[in-house]
């Protein structure tokens, strides 16, 4: 890849537009497919405890392929890696449409998502640089948030109309992402000719994990972000069961509206953190993390829709204020120790492992018959205690 290609590309070049459109459609499909498939499980009378299993097979793919996907992204043109990954997502969504086991289809989507993640972030640095790179990351995050909001709501609303229509819309979104990927210029591979010895690749990845874990600051960041995203995905599934019990509403759309309030709140909280927190004042974000658990506890006791909306937006605000500085800390310290790509891969492993653990505990609680409101209360209390313990540990070290 020539220097001119790397540095002189406009922020709104054809390639950058293609990346942003592909990211929006791919993330739209991910979020719509989750709620469409949950509606399918409900329509086919799967047990309630099976709902979080759906997300567990998705994140399981992330964990299984974590040591390898970074090298895949660096060994081939990233635009083509993204196209292949979206093709896997399309295949998974289409298989669910055609009646293949939804857990198998969703696993395929998870494999595609695992391959897609390092490529979508890595390609930004190949299409632009400097101050434009910061803006490009902002565009990527903005398109992702928009896709989360619109995709979640679309999945629930379309599923209330017809589950098959919702699933078909997800497949179309992935198909559109594949088409958008075609318009990304075929840049040279970042690190071609690497060894594909799986043992060596795994050993290298584990060395990066060990290096980050031994550093107090990066360990603190990894634990904090993992707790947050593990709790966030568990809250998504908690809402699906909580809404009919606490609010008496049985449609598929209402949980998606409530999830959208969390996403909006995260945007607000992230903006506040950017203005009020620096790497030197990291401790300012910790009270917000504790308050997430407290507000989840209060939210679980609600029986009216408007207070539920307000409290979930507040949870999102606290979440954005908490997690954005932790991400920045890991990126800054990780870049200097193991490289940004390895740091992101290790972070993905930590976050998805936390999701797997928390979803497993939640699924077990539902399976043994614990009512959803006490689950929510316990969930909020435990999260607040966990972040408090993390803060105490950070202050001592």
Curated annotation (Swiss-Prot):
Annotated membrane topology: Multi-pass membrane protein
Domain of life: Bacteria
Spans within the Periplasmic topological domain: 1-17, 74-90, 166, 248-256, 302-304, 365-366
Membrane side Cytoplasmic: residue ranges: 39-52, 112-144, 188-226, 278-280, 326-343, 388-397
SUPFAM superfamilies named among the record's database cross-references: MFS general substrate transporter
Transmembrane helix keyword on record: yes
Keywords: Cell inner membrane, Cell membrane, Lipid transport, Membrane, Transmembrane, Transmembrane helix, Transport
Bilayer-spanning residue ranges: 18-38, 53-73, 91-111, 145-165, 167-187, 227-247, 257-277, 281-301, 305-325, 344-364, 367-387
GO cellular component: plasma membrane
Any one Gene Ontology molecular-function term assigned to this protein's record: lysophospholipid:sodium symporter activity
Keyword Protein biosynthesis belongs to the record: no
Compartment annotation: Cell inner membrane
InterPro entries tied to this protein: LysoPLipid__transptr_LplT (IPR023727), MFS (IPR011701), MFS_trans_sf (IPR036259)
Function: Catalyzes the facilitated diffusion of 2-acyl-glycero-3-phosphoethanolamine (2-acyl-GPE) into the cell.
Family: Belongs to the major facilitator superfamily. LplT (TC 2.A.1.42) family.
Full protein name: Lysophospholipid transporter LplT
Organism: Shigella sonnei (strain Ss046)
């Amino acid at each position: 890849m020539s220097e001119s290609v790397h540095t002189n590309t406009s922020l709104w070049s054809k390639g950058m537009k293609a990346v942003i459109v592909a990211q929006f459609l791919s993330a739209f499909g991910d979020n719509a497919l989750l709620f469409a498939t949950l509606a399918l499980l409900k329509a086919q009378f799967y047990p309630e405890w099976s709902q979080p299993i759906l997300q567990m097979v998705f994140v399981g793919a992330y964990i299984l392929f974590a040591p390898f996907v970074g090298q895949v992204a660096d060994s081939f043109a990233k635009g083509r890696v993204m196209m292949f990954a979206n093709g896997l997502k399309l295949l998974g969504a289409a298989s669910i449409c055609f009646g293949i086991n939804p857990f198998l289809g969703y696993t395929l989507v998870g494999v595609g998502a695992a391959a897609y993640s390092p490529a979508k972030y890595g390609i930004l640095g190949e299409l632009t640089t400097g101050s434009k790179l910061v803006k490009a990351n902002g565009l990527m995050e903005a398109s992702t948030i928009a896709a989360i909001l619109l995709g979640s709501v679309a999945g629930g609303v379309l599923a209330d109309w017809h589950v098959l229509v919702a699933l078909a819309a997800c497949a179309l979104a992935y198909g559109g992402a594949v088409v958008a990927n075609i318009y990304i210029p075929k840049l040279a591979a970042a690190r071609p000719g690497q060894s594909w010895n799986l043992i060596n690749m795994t050993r290298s990845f584990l060395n990066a994990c060990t290096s980050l874990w031994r550093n107090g600051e990066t360990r603190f960041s990894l634990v904090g972000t993992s707790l947050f995203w593990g709790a966030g995905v568990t809250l998504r599934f908690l809402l699906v069961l909580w809404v009919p019990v606490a609010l008496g509403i049985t449609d598929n759309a209402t949980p998606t509206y409530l999830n959208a309030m969390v996403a909006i709140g995260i945007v607000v909280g992230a903006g506040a953190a950017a203005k009020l927190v620096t790497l030197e004042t990291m401790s300012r974000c910790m009270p917000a993390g504790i308050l997430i658990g407290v507000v989840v506890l209060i939210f679980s006791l609600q029986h009216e829709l408007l207070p539920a909306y307000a409290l979930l937006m507040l949870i999102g605000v606290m979440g954005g204020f908490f997690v954005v500085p932790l991400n920045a800390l890991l990126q800054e310290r990780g870049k200097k120790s193991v490289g940004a790509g390895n740091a992101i891969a290790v972070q993905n492993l930590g976050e998805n492992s936390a999701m797997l653990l928390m979803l497993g505990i939640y699924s077990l609680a539902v399976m043994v018959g614990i009512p959803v409101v006490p689950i929510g209360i316990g969930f909020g209390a435990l999260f607040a205690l966990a972040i408090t313990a993390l803060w105490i540990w950070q202050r001592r070290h």
